[in-house]
Amino acid sequence: EDCLGWFSRCSPKNDKCCPNYKCSSKDLWCKYKIW
């Protein structure tokens, strides 16, 4: 199953973003995790 890349729409309850990305609960797309 493919992970979701940057700016891909996602659901915070079911975060399928790629490693080092996190689903933004505000914008509802995958954002790069800097920390």
Swiss-Prot record:
Domain notes: The presence of a 'disulfide through disulfide knot' structurally defines this protein as a knottin.
One MF annotation (Gene Ontology) recorded for this entry: toxin activity
Pfam families on file: Toxin_12
Name of this protein: Beta/delta-theraphotoxin-Pre1a
Domain of life: Eukaryota
Site label Probable key residue for the interaction with Nav channels, positions: 7
Disulfide-linked positions: 3-18, 10-23, 17-30
Family: Belongs to the neurotoxin 10 (Hwtx-1) family.
UniProt keyword annotations, A-Z: Disulfide bond, Ion channel impairing toxin, Knottin, Neurotoxin, Secreted, Toxin, Voltage-gated sodium channel impairing toxin
Function: Gating-modifier toxin that both inhibits the peak current of human Nav1.1/SCN1A, rat Nav1.2/SCN2A, human Nav1.6/SCN8A, and human Nav1.7/SCN9A and concurrently inhibits fast inactivation of human Nav1.1 and rat Nav1.3/SCN3A. The relative rank order potency for Nav modulation is Nav1.3 (inactivation EC(50)=45 nM) > Nav1.7 > Nav1.2 > Nav1.1 (inactivation) > Nav1.1 > Nav1.6 > Nav1.3 (IC(50)=8 uM). The DII and DIV S3-S4 loops of Nav channel voltage sensors are important for the interaction of this toxin with Nav channels but cannot account for its unique subtype selectivity.
Main subcellular localisation: secreted
Segments forming a coiled coil: none
Note: NMR structure determination (PDB 5I1X) is done on a mutant of 36 residues with an additional Ser at first position and an Ala residue replacing the Phe-7. Functional information is not known on this mutant.
Record localization: Secreted
Tissue/organ expression: Expressed by the venom gland.
